[in-house]
Curated annotation (Swiss-Prot):
An example Gene Ontology biological process: chemotaxis to folate
Keywords from the UniProt entry: Cytoplasm, Leucine-rich repeat, Repeat
Pfam family, one: LRR_14
Main location: cytoplasm
SMART domains: LRR_BAC (SM00364), LRR_SD22 (SM00365), LRR_TYP (SM00369)
Subcellular location: Cytoplasm
GO cellular component, one term: cytoplasm
Name the UniProt record assigns to this protein: Leucine-rich repeat protein lrrA
Originating gene: lrrA
Length: 510
């Protein structure tokens, strides 16, 4: 498109525009006339560009340039002439082919630089001369380190170096006195420098998916933190006390090797999300969790918990409670769980439950309920009081029947009851008018209720691996629509007891 674009850029239509938007236009080459533009914003992302012409340096008014998602492998030194440039986006290109020009350091007004996803293994030290830089994204590259001189970027507010191969962070980061967000997740870090605790304005610290063996004891001095992500650092056995982090809203200590939760957790009254999943050495929750009254999400998946403390009933704002893959029995789930009246998602799968607590009937806000892969023998009648439920999964249990009250779940959309021992279904299930998917496979059903013929909204009805005679197997093999139509068509005769599965099969074959 180079030739046509050249003439267009010469025209008044583009030349005097403040914003030149050429995104997603399959452009593979920029003409020299690009330098004649008087725009403040030049948007060229999602094209097929390989090079940037040297005339780019003539854009005397440009403040924003977006070259993201091209195939650019070379930045001309003339880019250093763009004295007015404030934001430069070069993510998702191929800049590893040629070293990035050191002239990039001449961009004294640059506040935002994005070099992410370029397979870079080196960066020019001259970036440290971009003294106005507030946002620097060098994530998703192949960096083992970055220049120590980056510590001179005193105005930096956001630094993203995630998805690289960093083995350490330099102590020079203490110069980032204005830093608010630091993301160094998905690297090879074993330790953090103590100087990280000097970043007094830091609100978000993400060091997840590393190889951290130890954390600075002074972590609790970072009182501005609102989001602390330590997840998936398998060697980490100890998290220092966090009692001073009174503004913390999100804490993830997932997949560590801790045997107890950090001291002072109960003092973090602003916490909204607490992720403690996949800590198999952790066997109990401290009772002071009761003070976390603002908590909305509590993830305890994959621990060795045998008891839920009564104090969990104080978490009245909780919306999601994940207790999957623990060792809970019905005797160790307190009745106080019924106080969680704002709970929208309750997950109890992969435990040792033989029954469900009847107190779940109090959870009127519940939308999603899972208790699959337990040893449940019955569903409490009270389940029918959860009229707002949209998804239920009780697969992989020992259920032999479904209570008639199940038909009251008028908002239910997905119902998974596979791999049980259900031999009969209640006729009230025609009340599941909102249901789009029902899985009853791998049970002991011989007949489906005729009322299923009224569930016209069903797109998936799986009744495979049941000894069904009504409907007959040839109908079942044809799928959901055929099953629903067959039940509807034969309902009248079937209710009179004049229809057998074999007889209908023969009628359909004629």
């Amino acid at each position: 498109m180079g030739g046509n674009l050249s003439s267009e850029l010469k025209s008044t239509k583009y030349r005097k525009r403040e914003i030149v938007d050429l995104r997603k236009m399959n452009i593979d080459k920029l003409p020299p006339t690009i330098g004649a533009l008087q725009c403040k914003e030049l948007l060229l992302s999602e094209n097929d560009l390989i090079t940037i012409p040297e005339e780019i340096g003539k854009l005397s008014k440009v403040e924003i340039i977006d070259f993201a998602k091209n195939r650019i492998n070379y930045i001309p030194p003339e880019i250093g002439s763009l004295a007015t440039l404030k934001q430069l986006f070069l993510s998702n290109n191929k800049l590893f082919y040629t070293p990035i020009t050191p002239n990039i350091g001449a961009l004294k007004n640059l506040t935002r630089l994005d070099l992410s996803s370029n397979q870079l293994d080196d960066l020019p030290v001259e970036i440290s001369n971009c003294e106005a830089l507030e946002y620097l994204d060098i994530s998703d590259n192949q960096l083992q380190s970055f220049p120590l001189e980056f510590g001179k970027l005193y105005n930096l507010q956001v630094f993203n170096c995630s998805k690289n191969s960093l083995k350490s962070l330099p102590s020079e980061i203490s110069g980032w006195v204005k830093l608010e967000e630091l993301n160094v997740s998905n690297n090879q870090l074993a330790f953090l420098p103590n100087q990280i605790c000097l970043l007094g304005l830091l609100s978000t610290l993400n060091v997840g998916f590393n190889k951290l063996q130890q954390l600075p004891e002074e972590l609790s001095s970072m009182v501005s933190l609102t989001n602390l992500d330590l997840k998936v650092n398998p060697p980490l056995q100890y998290v220092p006390q966090l009692s001073n982090l009174r503004q913390l809203k999100i804490l993830s200590i997932r997949n560590l090797q801790i045997t107890h939760l950090p001291l002072g957790l109960g003092l973090l009254s602003e916490l909204i999300e607490l992720d403690i999943r996949d800590n198999p050495q952790l066997k109990e929750i401290p009772y002071d969790i009761a003070t976390l009254i603002n908590l909305q999400k509590l993830d305890l998946f994959g621990n060795n918990m045998r008891i839920v403390p009564r104090e969990v009933g104080n978490l009245i704002n909780l919306q999601t409670l994940d207790l999957r893959q623990n060792k809970l029995t019905i005797d160790n789930i307190p009745s106080e769980i019924g106080k969680l009246v704002n709970l929208k998602k309750l997950l109890l799968s992969n435990n040792l439950l033989i029954a469900l607590p009847p107190e779940i009937a109090s959870m009127k806000a519940l939308k999603e309920f899972e208790a699959s892969n337990n040893q449940l023998q019955a569903i409490p009648t009270e389940i029918g009081e959860l009229s707002g439920l949209t998804k239920i999964n009780l697969s992989g249990n020992k259920l032999t029947s479904i209570p008639a009250s199940f038909g009251n779940l008028s908002e239910l959309q997905i119902c998974d009851l596979k791999s049980n021992e259900i031999a009969e279904l209640p006729t009230t299930l025609d009340g599941l008018k909102s249901c789009t998917k029902i899985d009853l496979s791998h049970n002991m059903l011989t007949e489906l209720p005729w009322e299923f013929g009224d569930l016209i909204g069903l797109t998936i009805l799986d009744v495979g691996h049941n000894p069904l005679t009504i409907p007959p197997n040839p109908i079942v093999m044809k799928g959901t629509e055929s099953i629903i139509q067959w039940l509807k068509k034969n309902e009248k005769e079937g209710r009179k007891g004049k229809v057998s599965g074999l007889g209908i099969q023969q009628d359909n074959e004629k």
